[in-house]
UniProtKB/Swiss-Prot annotation:
The gene is acpS. It is an enzyme of class 2 (transferase). It is found in: Cytoplasm. Keywords: Cytoplasm, Fatty acid biosynthesis, Fatty acid metabolism, Lipid biosynthesis, Lipid metabolism, Magnesium, Metal-binding, Transferase. This is Holo-[acyl-carrier-protein] synthase. It comes from Clostridium botulinum (strain Alaska E43 / Type E3). InterPro entries: 4-PPantetheinyl_Trfase_dom, 4-PPantetheinyl_Trfase_dom_sf, ACPS, Ppantetheine-prot_Trfase_dom. GO terms for cellular component: cytoplasm.
Length: 123
């Protein structure tokens, strides 16, 4: 059963400017594992924007936006084939009673925008 669907679109240039103007931007919104992935991708603004959009999409699929939690509670990584995967903090497991669920995300981008979709399925 589908519990929620979320989508978000981000202007890559806006994220690029935020990174350039705020040295703490990446550390403030992304986990250590996400930052390790960004290093492998040479801190590509498209990649960072895609992850940002994915976090927003997941928050919308949860049905609350970012009420009571933050971007660091949602971690977007890649599996061995490059497919994006989501890890949630223990706080979110408890907050949304997500014991038996799957989260599916898709991330894409053009030269100017990054977009992400998230679907939460209850098993």
């Amino acid at each position: 059963m589908i519990k929620g669907i979320g989508t978000d679109i981000v202007e890559i240039e806006r994220i690029k400017k935020a990174i350039e103007s705020n040295p703490n931007f990446i550390n403030r919104f992304f986990t250590e594992k996400e930052i390790e992935y960004f290093k492998l991708r040479k801190f590509n603004a498209n990649t960072i924007s895609g992850n940002f959009a994915a976090k927003e999409a997941v928050s919308k699929a949860l049905g609350s936006g970012f009420r009571g939690f933050g971007l660091m509670d949602i971690e977007v990584l890649r599996d061995e084939l490059g497919k994006p995967i989501v890890n949630l903090s223990d706080k979110l497991y408890k907050m949304f009673n997500l014991d038996n669920y799957n989260i599916f995300i898709s991330i894409s981008h053009s030269n100017t925008d990054a977009i992400a979709y998230a679907i939460i399925e209850v098993i």
